[in-house]
């Protein structure tokens, strides 16, 4: 890891009780095929969708379901996540295998 995990906690404004969980969430399968972030990513995608949906529901109480769905899709997608990851310099914290380049997280 190029930078330490405590500096990442400061950037995102969250102090983890279990830093091993944070470390796992930052571990790409190329670094550790058995203990990596894939299952946490699955769970995180659902949590992110729920949190954003709840906020959209509160912010736009008169919008129809289809309009809320379009807003959700514009906020929760790979392109937006890549933008946020790059803004946070996530590539400085992700653990990848020797054959994987994490110099920039790209929208692929």
Located regions from the model:
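RNase III-family endoribonuclease catalytic core
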Residues: 1-108
